[in-house]
Regions:
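Catalytic-site neighborhoods of secreted/periplasmic enzymes
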Residues: 1-83, 119-129
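Active-site-proximal cap/lid insertion segments
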Residues: 56-189
Length: 192
């Protein structure tokens, strides 16, 4: 819709668009994973629903070592917590680094952070400084809804969950700060 209206369109982050098909850009006719077809697949341009800037993956839930396929189909292996990296890419897009969009045209940018995502089990799911905010808090202060069973083993995972939410808030805030810095905050529709 936005693309048809003349907008530059960018997608950054996790998106289940393409089903498992043998579409590995580096090995035509092969799946991106040899052992089984996976939903974590490269999405060819004709299946991106009008997004002309692409930096995405399907279902790879390794938050501190994510990978992405770019617009040209090049796979990027990253060693950084995915929301921080995706915020960096969004800010780069807003600044139009690399001339990735026509600055005379309006743009639509969609950013989809993967965390918070289960299993919320370790520091691989969040940033340590965010976990430190919650690690020593009693579960009763975190699990305040009356229908939560605090005796379940996985109740303690709420600390990792809240740490992930805190980190995502910070990453999203950096994008909002960049919009404000560029004077685009009053001209932008932000949907969370």
């Amino acid at each position: 819709m936005f693309s048809q209206a003349g907008y530059n369109c960018a997608y950054i982050g996790k998106l289940h668009v393409d089903c498992p098909t043998p579409n590995d850009p580096e090995r035509p006719g092969k799946y991106v994973e040899d052992r089984v077809p996976a939903w974590d697949a490269y999405t060819p341009a004709d299946r991106r629903h009008g997004f002309d800037y692409w930096y995405s993956y399907g279902t790879y839930d390794v938050h501190k070592h994510p990978h992405y396929w770019d617009t040209e189909g090049v796979k990027h292996e990253i060693n950084e917590w995915s929301p921080e990296h995706e915020a960096d890419k969004a800010i780069s897009y807003l600044r139009n680094e690399g001339n990735v969009r026509d600055p005379k045209k309006p743009f639509f940018m969609m950013v989809s952070f993967n965390p918070p995502h289960s299993p919320y089990a370790s520091l691989e799911d969040c940033m340590e400084e965010d976990y430190d905010l919650y690690k020593d808090l009693p579960l009763d202060s975190l699990l305040i809804r009356p229908n939560v069973n605090r005796e379940m083993k996985k109740a303690a995972s709420v600390r990792y969950y809240f740490a992930s939410v805190t980190g995502v808030d910070r990453a999203f805030g950096r994008i909002l700060d960049e919009l404000e810095k560029q004077g685009l905050d009053k001209l932008s529709l932000i949907h969370i």
